[in-house]
Amino acid sequence: MKTYLVGGAVRDELLGLPVRERDWVVVGATAAQMLDLGYRQVGRDFPVFLHPETHEEHALARTERKTAPGYRGFVVHAEPDVTLEEDLLRRDLTINAMARDEAGGLIDPFNGRADLEARLLRHVSPAFAEDPVRILRVARFAARFAHLGFRVADETRALMRRMVAAGEVDALVPERVWQEMERALGEGSPATFFEVLRDCGALAVLFPEIERLFGVPQPPKYHPEIDTGVHTLMVLTQAARLSADATIRFAALTHDLGKGTTPADILPSHHGHEQRSVDLVHALCDRFRIPNAYRDLAVMVARWHGYSHRALELRPDTVLKALEGLDAFRRPERFEPFLLACEADYRGRTGFEDRPYPQADYLRAAHARCLAISAKDLVNEGLTGKAIGEALHARRVQALKQLKAEWGG
């Protein structure tokens, strides 16, 4: 029985990155032996155990054989006769197929270290094509390591395209797609995830509402980059600069989905795209069972981002209408994420990447001025019933008029 450190821990240590978690492969052991040693079994589909002291995952060395389409159609063989190299062979990328033995020696049968140095994401073997989830994983690793200059190897890109053409991606269940997408949104370069999926054709299959944004023109006066798909990924990149919050990044990604269904005869104008975007956000979230925290912010940004951009030009009563529409008084915790997503949209244009966004500060000030006027104060003044709401509205509008004057409006 021998134990080897495998996968991401070995990769990240060689890259000089913090090791997030340590996974181990055990060769020459049975499940019964692991239990006798005090390990606790947690794997449902194959034998994975938690170490009795460190609680790190230890998996029996295994092989996998494809028996049906999709990512679940596998038969697992995990017996003492499975070698370390056989276990590493079933892994997705060469950079994830390295191990260290108990003495710390590197075991690298598929040249993962060379691919690390060449900054290549390369599949280990043709068996890569048996699991369509690997397409999503490659895209996610590309998003994680983009800042280090990694790219997908040409032969791996070609294999991914063949997998998509063969319909393998169609077998992915929504929850698994969202799981990988959510993780990708948290990576350093989330736009790269969608670029890789687009390159292999998977974006059109999984996220057609994003794919159809590419090639759709916008007015060059406001969008020097012109292409709506290019703009969308620029906005996502800006959102990643502004915040690590994945809900903000998702809202940035989906804020303009309605521009993909703009009638051709009104292009490059996109009149009414906000409501179309809202409808598409709901459909996307329903399809992938995306949590409400993502849906709620994305809908807010899709519907109201134009008001944010025009904040300095709006009448005070219109600013108040927007704040009420955003539910900013009852749900103030969502207001700052909304403003950050709008700032990302403003900056996600060629030549605008580092420009200030004073609209956000203006709306923050407007929100604060309105919050300072409460219904409780009006009740204390003796107002009742409808008069409270009317007075609250009037005083908030007056406060916003004063604010606009202070800002030179």
Swiss-Prot record:
Catalysed reactions, as listed in the record: a tRNA precursor + 2 CTP + ATP = a tRNA with a 3' CCA end + 3 diphosphate; a tRNA with a 3' CCA end + 2 CTP + ATP = a tRNA with a 3' CCACCA end + 3 diphosphate
Binding residues for Mg(2+): 21, 23
Cofactor details (free text): Magnesium is required for nucleotidyltransferase activity.
Swiss-Prot/TrEMBL keywords: ATP-binding, Hydrolase, Magnesium, Metal-binding, Multifunctional enzyme, Nickel, Nucleotide-binding, Nucleotidyltransferase, RNA repair, RNA-binding, Transferase, tRNA processing
Keyword Hydrolase (UniProt): yes
A Pfam entry, by short name: PolyA_pol_RNAbd
Domain of life of the organism encoding this protein: Bacteria
Ligand binding (CTP): 8, 11, 91, 137, 140
EC number: 2.7.7.72, 3.1.3.-, 3.1.4.-
Function description: Catalyzes the addition and repair of the essential 3'-terminal CCA sequence in tRNAs without using a nucleic acid template. Adds these three nucleotides in the order of C, C, and A to the tRNA nucleotide-73, using CTP and ATP as substrates and producing inorganic pyrophosphate. tRNA 3'-terminal CCA addition is required both for tRNA processing and repair. Also involved in tRNA surveillance by mediating tandem CCA addition to generate a CCACCA at the 3' terminus of unstable tRNAs. While stable tRNAs receive only 3'-terminal CCA, unstable tRNAs are marked with CCACCA and rapidly degraded.
Family in the record: Belongs to the tRNA nucleotidyltransferase/poly(A) polymerase family. Bacterial CCA-adding enzyme type 1 subfamily.
Oligomeric and partner information: Monomer. Can also form homodimers and oligomers.
Full protein name: Multifunctional CCA protein
Species of provenance: Thioalkalivibrio sulfidiphilus (strain HL-EbGR7)
